[in-house]
Curated annotation (Swiss-Prot):
GO molecular function: rRNA binding; structural constituent of ribosome
Assigned protein family: Belongs to the universal ribosomal protein uS4 family.
Taxonomy of the source species: Eukaryota, Viridiplantae, Streptophyta, Embryophyta, Tracheophyta
Domain of life of the source: Eukaryota
Function noted in UniProt: One of the primary rRNA binding proteins, it binds directly to 16S rRNA where it nucleates assembly of the body of the 30S subunit.
Gene: rps4
GO CC terms in record: chloroplast; small ribosomal subunit
Localization per record: Plastid, Chloroplast
Species assigned in the record: Tigridia sp. (strain Lejeune 1997)
One Pfam match: Ribosomal_S4
Protein name as it appears in the record: Small ribosomal subunit protein uS4c
Oligomer and partners: Part of the 30S ribosomal subunit. Contacts protein S5. The interaction surface between S4 and S5 is involved in control of translational fidelity.
InterPro entries listed in its UniProt record: Ribosomal_uS4, Ribosomal_uS4_bac-type, Ribosomal_uS4_CS, Ribosomal_uS4_N, S4_RNA-bd, S4_RNA-bd_sf
């Protein structure tokens, strides 16, 4: 993980740690002219590592975004931001996207009253995301909410921290996307 964030810069979904500031010797050695190929590859890798996708999953999302109306890049980012694991991360119910994936895989999360154990589940507007009624699930989420830095919540989400409930209001607006992609 740390090699990835050193190479690609801060990836808030992958880890809460930041690359050290200052000039590395390695960065000086590779500071030559960046080719278009290298820029595109680094941006693709940022997407993959931030959202925790495999190459095949990313290709599938690019294919879906290409068929949709609008800018392919914007539609792609909207699709990725509306994944269940990412929404849990944005709500503050998990400290990282891999942590959110684990919550979903271990069946702690309900969407509209039904257990969902697929992290790539695509949330829709008016979806209600809650925790299981088990004490263990609530304690996990409570610890994440208490320990997470209270960042500004995107417009498309609302959270009720007392009931451990989140609501998807609408599809995300492009200015609220957390990752800066070139």
């Amino acid at each position: 993980r740390f090699k990835k964030i050193r190479r690609l810069g801060a990836l808030p979904g992958l880890t809460s740690k930041r690359p050290r500031s200052g000039i590395d010797l390695k960065n000086q050695l590779r500071s030559g002219k960046r080719s278009q190929y290298r820029i595109r590859l680094e941006e693709k890798q940022k997407l993959r590592f931030h959202y925790g996708l495999t190459e095949r999953q990313l290709l599938k999302y690019v294919h879906i975004a290409g068929k949709a109306k609008g800018s392919t890049g914007q539609v792609l980012l909207q699709l990725l931001e509306m994944r269940l694991d990412n929404i849990l991360f944005r709500l503050g119910m998990a400290s990282t996207i891999p942590g959110a994936r684990q919550l979903v895989n271990h069946r702690h999360i309900l969407v509209n009253g039904r257990i969902v154990d697929i992290p790539s589940y695509r949330c829709k507007p008016r979806d209600i995301i809650t925790t299981k009624d088990k004490e263990r699930s609530k304690v996990l989420i409570q610890n994440y909410i208490a320990s997470s830095p209270h960042e500004e919540l995107p417009n498309h989400l609302t959270i009720d921290p007392l009931q451990y409930k989140g609501l998807v209001n609408q599809i995300i607006d492009s200015k609220w996307i957390g990752l800066k992609i070139n």
